[in-house]
Amino acid sequence: FVDGWLATYGDGVQRRSRNAEELETVLRYGVGTTEYMRSTGGFALTLECGQHDDPTSPEVAYRAIMNTLVHLGLVAGEDPAPTPFDDMEALSMVVVYDKLHEGDTFERPWKSFDAVAEGERIGTRADGTPVLAEFSGRILFPAASAAANTEWYYLTRPNPSFGREHG
């Protein structure tokens, strides 16, 4: 599970914005269906089913969608057994890093959910300055081909309290 998308996205947008009008426009762009529904008092979630080269991914995605629909009571079926808390990983997106110059490069071909250790070299700025992980966590949405002054990657922290607040 990953939470914290909109706040982290908004922090990056605010940092890059030139004026209030641009900020408002770009923040509206970041508000998708889930955030809009929540803002109006509704219930919403985003179910990421992945898009990768795993040949089982279509079945995994179908099962995830059907399990969610059954669990929410939207279709008939047997409610899936809950995943024990100790078997799941919950993360909070906490910071987005920008590619500052076209010459900024990653240390290696990162993939979403790769683990990073505090102090680990993630990349190198065009001027040779190392880009180091400021804390241990996981990298999300690494974009090696990002343009200058746009999102380059996000970092997450573990969120051990996720889902336990009401249980």
For each predicted feature, which ranges?
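Structured catalytic-domain cores with a bias toward divalent-metal coordination
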Residues: 1-167
